[in-house]
């Protein structure tokens, strides 16, 4: 039997606006075992992204979890401080954002952004991090990785930017 790695129980999340409370999630519950693949489908605005962001602890103000629990690997992550969460975010749990152009920083090269993630979550040296970044680009099917590491997000196609996001998620 597989080990349960993620469990969402009766998650409720609201956005508190000047016009009042907007309930974005109301009773979301699911669990995943190691090796599971989960597809969340729904209409635009149905809460798919809000669910993913809440699991990652990335709910933007004025959003707030108002009920339920989020468990990851036996830890109740919805009660973690930002400092505690930062230790697992990107290291044990990652998200691949739908629109890489809004997630990649336009003023830094692809290489700098991947290396930053590696250095933040591993004990690798800068040289080792650059070598790992190159390996990751190859792993996700980006040709000419040495050249791509020096490029900026706007210089890559949408599909290549998405692959860069996948490489960043795999970096740790």
Regions of interest found by a model, annotated:
Residues 1-172:
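ABC transporter nucleotide-binding domains
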């Amino acid at each position: 039997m597989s080990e349960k790695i993620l469990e969402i129980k009766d998650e409720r999340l609201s956005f508190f606006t000047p016009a009042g409370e907007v309930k974005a999630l109301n009773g979301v519950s699911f669990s995943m075992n190691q090796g599971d693949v989960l597809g969340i489908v729904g209409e635009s605005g149905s809460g798919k992204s809000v669910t993913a962001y809440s699991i990652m602890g990335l709910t933007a103000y004025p959003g707030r979890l108002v009920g339920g629990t989020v468990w990851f690997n036996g830890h109740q992550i919805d009660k973690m401080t930002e400092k505690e969460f930062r230790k697992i975010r990107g290291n044990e749990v990652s998200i691949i954002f739908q629109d890489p152009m809004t997630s990649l920083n336009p003023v830094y090269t692809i290489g700098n952004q991947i290396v930053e993630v590696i250095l933040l979550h591993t004990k690798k040296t800068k040289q080792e991090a650059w070598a790992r970044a190159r390996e990751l680009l190859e792993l996700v099917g980006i040709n000419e990785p040495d050249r791509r590491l020096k490029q900026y997000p706007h210089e890559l196609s949408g599909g290549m930017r998405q692959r860069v996001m996948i490489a960043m998620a795999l970096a740790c």
